Amino acid sequence: MNNKFLSLLAVCFLVFSCKSEDKKTEENVESTETNAVKKMLVQMDVIQTTANNYAVYYTEDNTINFTTEYVIWNEVKPSPNVQTLDFSFPESAYPTHVRFDLGNNPQTDDVVLNKFKLSYGDKSLEAKGSDFFNYFLKNDSIATEIDQAKGSIKFLKKKGSKAVPFFYPNEVMMLEIAKLMK
């Protein structure tokens, strides 16, 4: 009788201890998912045949007062092929507006933007280069050529011009960023 009782007690102990471990594992997975760090990431697919430095400026105060305090730089290596540039925002950043600066090298060649993507957590906005001006204001000091067939935009460098090709967000981009950040 004692042996049967001890055996039954051991089986109960095993069954209940295994269930609590499964429950703890499920809780840990849920906790890890909710504690996953969300941060903004901007990606650009570009063709740049001269060395350059690109920047993404951002603000967190619903203005377009961009400063060097809120900027992410990315070195662009010269290549005739498409390269993807990643601009990873700080974890604490909560951008409301972004500005693209496509190079600070006055000796640069034309720049081709095939696409760009903004993502935050599991949400993203991806657009072809040819749709660039659906999201950004045109900068009259920079000439552009849009190739609808390729879905790209080319930013043309004027000889002797020292103008930096920078582009402010329009209302559509501001709304899209707000959707991403919710």
Task: List the predicted regions and their residue ranges.
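Sec-dependent signal peptide recognition
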Residues: 2-9
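C-terminal motif of bacterial Sec signal peptides marking the signal peptidase cleavage site
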Residues: 14-17
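Bacterial signal peptide processing site
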Residues: 19-22
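Post-signal peptide N-terminal segment of mature Sec-exported envelope proteins
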Residues: 26-49
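Noncatalytic modules at the cell exterior or secretory-pathway interfaces
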Residues: 37-43, 90-100, 149-151
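Extracellular carbohydrate recognition and processing domains
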Residues: 63-91, 135-137, 144-147
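Extracellular beta-strand ligand-recognition surfaces/modules
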Residues: 82-108
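Short acidic/polar inter-strand loop motif in beta-rich domains
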Residues: 104-112, 117-125
